[in-house]
Structures are given as structure tokens and as C-alpha cells.
Amino acid sequence: MKKEIIIIALVFALGGSAAAIFLKSGWDKKVAPPQEETGFWENEEKTKLTIENVEFEVEIAQTLTERTKGLADRTDLCSQCGMLFIFEADNYHAFWMKGTFIPLDIIWLDKNWQVVDFTAFAQPQAGRPDEELPIYRPKTPARYVLELPGGTVEKIRGFKVGSQVELER
């Protein structure tokens, strides 16, 4: 009996330590963009950007909670609207359409705001089990991801891998 109590106490102590480390790690902190932009996104909820002379107003998703939620549960998105996902580092940031009700174009950007890859017209997957949902990944590591209404990239004259995205400052 004493042995069981000691084991249970040890499990709780280790679990509490792990939880404290996790909570202190800042898992939901605002993400810092590249050094030259430090502070640019702080307290920002939206920004304007331009791709091939077409302007968009996009919401900024910079915390883990915001990035996880993304555009899920939205039933519409204006033609000049979208969401910009800010990440700390370049990576093969993967996206899926869980809980998303509208088609989206997913655009991956490098740290210099250049398009490195995109998926046009990712379709909603209502009713499909999570394990059957397609996962969309870039072919090249990216720092930022931009989601726009499905079909937008086809309408932007000159849009391609290599297109430059310009931010309003």
C-alpha cells in the first residue's frame, strides 16, 4: 500500500512539474516576426497586403490558439479578405480543412514575403473523419501562410510562385 501511495505521489509531482514547464513556455505567446519587424504585429488584429497589385485586408493569426482556429466555422469570406498566419520559423507548415465551410486558396510565403508554394481551391470536407482529411503542405519551407477565398489566385493576373507580397506599414 505504501509503495502505491509513493508511486501515485511521484506521478502527481512529475505531472505538476511538466504542466508548470508547459505553462511557462509561452506556448500561446505572440510570435515575433523576423528581427527587422520586431513589434510590428504586437496588438495587431488586421493588416492590408497586396499581391500583384490586388489589395486584401487580412486578419492576423499569431498565437497558437488563433492559428489552430484559423477560418474554421466561417460560412463566408469577402473576396478581398483572408487570414495571415504568422510563424516563428520557416517550416513545412501543414494545413487542413477541419471545420472549414468555404473553399480556400492556401499560399505559403518565405521570410521575405515571396510566394514559395500554393494550393488553389482547397475544398471543405464536412462530415469526413479527421483521419481522412487531406493535409496541405508546401514543397518549400515557409514562414507565413495566407488563406484567401477559393479561386482568388486564379483571378490575380500574374500570380505565381515567386510573386511578391507587399505589406502596408
Where are these regions (language model features)?
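Catalytic phosphate/metal-binding cores of nucleic-acid and nucleotide-processing enzymes, i.e., regions
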Residues: 9, 14
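Compact, glycine-rich, soluble single-domain proteins
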Residues: 2-7, 19-169
